[in-house]
C-alpha cells in the first residue's frame, strides 16, 4: 500500500466471519468484498463457486486503475463434503464406504475449480498489464476421514500441514521466480522479493532466517 497499490480483499463467505470486516482494514486493505456483494451467484452445493470469485477478482483488476493488490480467499472446496453428488461428479475408488462419497465430492469440487482456474489464468495471460498470480492453500481438508490413516503420504505427520503453491507471471521471460519449499509466513516476503518491493525489515528477515521450510518458530 505504501508503494501506491490499491488494496482489495475478496472472500465469498460471510462478511463478519473471523471478523474479517474488522481485521482486513486493520491490515491495510482499502476495500473488502464479501459474499453479500455477489448477486445470485453460481454455487457448488452450499458454497459460492470459485468461478464467481475469480470473475469478481477480474472485475476489480479491470475496474481499478494503477497498481492493484487483490487478496482473494476462496471457499468452494472447504469441508464438509457430505452433500449429494453434483452433476459433474468424479468417480473415485479404493476408499472405505464412509469416505467414498466425501472423496467423490471433494475430487469433483477440485475438478470444477481447476477448470475455473484455467479460465482465470487464460484471462490474466491475455492482459496487457503485467500481472503476478500467487496461488496457495491455507490448510489441508478435514482430518476426520479414514483415508488419512491409510495413505502413506499422511503417515508423516508434517505432511498434514503442507499445501502446494505456485507463482506465475503473465509476461514470459520477465520474472522467473525460483519455487522452493517454504513457510506460508514467508511467502509474502518471497513475492515482495520477486517484484522488488522488499524493505529494510524484509531484508533483515531474509538475511537472518532465509525462507524457513521446517516446522519451527523463532522467539522475538
Which sequence ranges carry the predicted segments?
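Solvent-exposed soluble domains appended to multi-pass membrane proteins
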Residues: 1-220
Amino acid at each position: 500500500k505504501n508503494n501506491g497499490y490499491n488494496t482489495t480483499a475478496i472472500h465469498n463467505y460471510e462478511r463478519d466471519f473471523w471478523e474479517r470486516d474488522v481485521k482486513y482494514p486493520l491490515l491495510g486493505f482499502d476495500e473488502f468484498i464479501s459474499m453479500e456483494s455477489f448477486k445470485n451467484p453460481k454455487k457448488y452445493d452450499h458454497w459460492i463457486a470459485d468461478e464467481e470469485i475469480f470473475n469478481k477478482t477480474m472485475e476489480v483488476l479491470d475496474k481499478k486503475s494503477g497498481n492493484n493488490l487483490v487478496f482473494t480467499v476462496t471457499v468452494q472446496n472447504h469441508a464438509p463434503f457430505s452433500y449429494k453428488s453434483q452433476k459433474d461428479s468424479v468417480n473415485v475408488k479404493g476408499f472405505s464406504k464412509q469416505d467414498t462419497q466425501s472423496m467423490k465430492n471433494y475430487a469433483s469440487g477440485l475438478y470444477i475449480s481447476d477448470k475455473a482456474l484455467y479460465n482465470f489464468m487464460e484471462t490474466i495471460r491475455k492482459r496487457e498489464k503485467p500481472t503476478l498470480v500467487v496461488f496457495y492453500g491455507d490448510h489441508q481438508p478435514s482430518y476426520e476421514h479414514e483415508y488419512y490413516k491409510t495413505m502413506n503420504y499422511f503417515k508423516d505427520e508434517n505432511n498434514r500441514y503442507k499445501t502446494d503453491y505456485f507463482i506465475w507471471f503473465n509476461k514470459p521471460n520477465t520474472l522467473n521466480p525460483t519455487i522452493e519449499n517454504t513457510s506460508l509466513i514467508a511467502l509474502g516476503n518471497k513475492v515482495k522479493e520477486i517484484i522488488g518491493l522488499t524493505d529494510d525489515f524484509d531484508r533483515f528477515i531474509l538475511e537472518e532466517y532465509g525462507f524457513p521450510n521446517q516446522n519451527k518458530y523463532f522467539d522475538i
